[in-house]
């Protein structure tokens, strides 16, 4: 095993009810995406859900936006996520034209700057 610290891989939000629950939390609007977050109040790994509405474009464009967001979370932002927190990222069309470096920096900056306070 190497000397590097173990990365905590975020889980996934899969059910509609989980996505709807996060809507009650903090909303951070930006040019590239909307970030919603909600503290669950436990010490489990963070969970992430990514969604792109049909208003954004056709299926090919929506899938490309999802892939870019997933990779930005995997490569850069996962280390900044707080345990016991659910995150929903709503992608916008501008992600298609944004440089990947700008996307991952913006995502990391928003997550790092807004770790929610514990509730409960």
From Swiss-Prot:
<dbReference type="Pfam" id="PF00825">
    <property type="entry name" value="Ribonuclease_P"/>
</dbReference>
<dbReference type="InterPro" id="IPR020539">
    <property type="entry name" value="RNase_P_CS"/>
</dbReference>
<keyword id="KW-0819">tRNA processing</keyword>
<keyword id="KW-0694">RNA-binding</keyword>
<comment type="function">
    <text>RNaseP catalyzes the removal of the 5'-leader sequence from pre-tRNA to produce the mature 5'-terminus. It can also cleave other RNA substrates such as 4.5S RNA. The protein component plays an auxiliary but essential role in vivo by binding to the 5'-leader sequence and broadening the substrate specificity of the ribozyme.</text>
</comment>
<keyword id="KW-0540">Nuclease</keyword>
<dbReference type="InterPro" id="IPR020568">
    <property type="entry name" value="Ribosomal_Su5_D2-typ_SF"/>
</dbReference>
<keyword id="KW-0378">Hydrolase</keyword>
<comment type="similarity">
    <text>Belongs to the RnpA family.</text>
</comment>
<dbReference type="GO" id="GO:0042781">
    <property type="term" value="F:3'-tRNA processing endoribonuclease activity"/>
</dbReference>
<dbReference type="GO" id="GO:0004526">
    <property type="term" value="F:ribonuclease P activity"/>
</dbReference>
<comment type="subunit">
    <text>Consists of a catalytic RNA component (M1 or rnpB) and a protein subunit.</text>
</comment>
<dbReference type="GO" id="GO:0030677">
    <property type="term" value="C:ribonuclease P complex"/>
</dbReference>
<dbReference type="GO" id="GO:0000049">
    <property type="term" value="F:tRNA binding"/>
</dbReference>
<dbReference type="InterPro" id="IPR014721">
    <property type="entry name" value="Ribsml_uS5_D2-typ_fold_subgr"/>
</dbReference>
<dbReference type="GO" id="GO:0001682">
    <property type="term" value="P:tRNA 5'-leader removal"/>
</dbReference>
<keyword id="KW-0255">Endonuclease</keyword>
<dbReference type="InterPro" id="IPR000100">
    <property type="entry name" value="RNase_P"/>
</dbReference>
<protein>
    <recommendedName>
        <fullName>Ribonuclease P protein component</fullName>
        <ecNumber>3.1.26.5</ecNumber>
    </recommendedName>
</protein>
